[in-house]
Amino acid sequence: GGNKEITDALSLYNRNGNIGFNDYGDEIDGPWDGPRTPSTTSFYVNDKYESDDLVINAGIRVDQFNLDDWKMKNTANPGWDETGQTILPDEFSDSDKKTVIQPRLGMAFPVSDRTVFHLQYGKYAQMPELDLPYASSRYMHLVWGGQNYTPDPMGFDLDPIETTQYEIGLSYQFSAAAAFDFTAFAKNTIGQIVISKNEDTDPACVSNGTCTQYYGADEDALYYENGDFSTINGFEFAFRTRRINRLQTYASYTWTDARGVNSDANSGAGNLTQEALAAPPAMIMPLYYENKHRGSIAMDYRFGDGDGGLLLSNLGVNLQYKFNSGHPFTLSDGGMGQRSSDSGALLDDARAREPQEPIGQSTTPWNHFINLKVDKKLSIGDYGVTVFAYVENLLNTKNVINVYSRSGNAYNDGFLTDPALSSEIVAAQGDLYVDLYENVNLANRQHYTLDFGQDLYSTPRTYKFGASINF
């Protein structure tokens, strides 16, 4: 009976997070590792009121979210059997359905014959990302067993993430052919997911009466919960013209200030491993996804129907220039931790990462893109066909979108140039190791893409061709 014993042993060793499939890609069913069916039920009603020059749009949306997840009966004592490496069913129940009411209000009225004032208020809600609550029972063993540092745990019965947004602005038409719009905005988001450690998970609950039996979850195990927030403030300026002599132009600029405690759910993982900082400090800081400056300029040159002869009729050319400032990052240092020599000393493990400056003080370089689109409308019988060619990043600009946190640039990860990190490895493995490291990791970023799931540079020049049919 060796085959089943081997496959069972391999499954326990893998301890992955498959939901709905086993290790071999076969579909499975069951209460714990079977497929989940999250759902959203929505209702929306809107009414528009007009009186003289005043326009009011008011509405309300109601969402009911069902994550199809599990809920712990006692979060201070998770029902986990470490000996059998399985869930104790009586200690869990179905997660609650969450209902969120979201009012919306928009208003516009003129203050002169060329100026219109507008404002908007709205509440919005969405489910958390589904990879945060969903985990197989074997992955729970990895998290709750306490044998490993696992910075990607799971959450139970998570609440929706709610956003309140405010906008106020005005539109001004300063000529018959041109107008601009200015809008200031504020966005407050609460209930974002954050990594945490349940300080109440302790055998002491047996003696103080908060639980009748202490189960097998490690008292230092991490989990996800709702508890983070962010605030985004800014303004947007847009300029547009009517089409004059076949040419229409549009330009926009947005300034944004994004601040919060954590840039993503795992930002505080390093603090939770340090007993002196058991609770992450609630410091407000720039968020890593902030682009302080963002803008675009577009020119669209287009022939009308019957204009320019058969070849040029309904032909259009659109040229767009886009730019944005970089995003915040933190220059850091630290040892290799548990990394192997082929992947260098990337600072992906928060336990080995030591900030060398205030969080989010540095910024990646600015990005610049030029895109070109050419399209032509054709009439084929009763059908309208539009064929197009689109070139993204026309000049093939190599924009830096991420950097190594040790060096602050995208071409040197700071490993080979730091003798304290690499001298012993280079001495043992020789020049061939250096050559392979420079070509595989630095030139082709293999270690970075494998660790972080993204690249250091933007997408190179891309060609797209297509057609759409209207009937």
Predicted regions and their residues:
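Outer-membrane beta-barrel channels and translocator barrels
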Residues: 51-54, 110-114, 163, 175-177, ...
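Residues on the lipid-exposed face of transmembrane beta-strands in outer-membrane beta-barrel proteins
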Residues: 43-49, 105-109, 168-172, 237-241, ...
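Residues that define the transmembrane beta-barrel architecture of outer-membrane proteins
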Residues: 37-41, 97-101, 162-166, 231-233, ...
